[in-house]
Amino acid sequence: MAKPSKKNRTHEKRKVRVRKKLFGTQDRPRLSVFRSAKHIYAQVIIDETGQTIAGASTLDKEAKDKGGFESKVEAAKFVGKLVAQRAKEKGVTKVVFDRNGFLYHGRVKAVSTGARDGGLEF
């Protein structure tokens, strides 16, 4: 069987290291971000109960209705605002940001910026 690439191994190490320290509670749920080559996903999770309170991605109807984005970073910022809006509707204002092993740069940073602009407090 093929050995995972060094890039994937280091990503998994970062992910485990970050998740050891983060835990979403009822008061401060976890805002988790996942990015693929084409899309970005964000969801607000309570780890105590395993519930997902709110979620958004570039595949959502609102994002598609908005039309073509200038860049993936702009789309990620829109997803951040969208997940913040949905979380605030459920009564969540404070979250813990989980970058999910991805470097805090580019699209991951844009999601957090959009969520802050949308009214979530980190």
Curated annotation (Swiss-Prot):
Family classification: Belongs to the universal ribosomal protein uL18 family.
Signal peptide extent: none
Keyword Acetylation applies: no
Record-linked HAMAP family: Ribosomal_uL18_B
Single biological process term from Gene Ontology: translation
Quaternary structure note: Part of the 50S ribosomal subunit; part of the 5S rRNA/L5/L18/L25 subcomplex. Contacts the 5S and 23S rRNAs.
Biological role stated in the UniProt entry: This is one of the proteins that bind and probably mediate the attachment of the 5S RNA into the large ribosomal subunit, where it forms part of the central protuberance.
Protein name as annotated: Large ribosomal subunit protein uL18
GO molecular function: 5S rRNA binding; structural constituent of ribosome
Annotated Gene Ontology cellular component terms: cytosolic large ribosomal subunit
Pfam hit, one: Ribosomal_L18p
Gene3D superfamilies in UniProt: 3.30.420.100
Entry superkingdom: Bacteria
Cell membrane is among the record's keywords: no
Keywords: Ribonucleoprotein, Ribosomal protein, RNA-binding, rRNA-binding
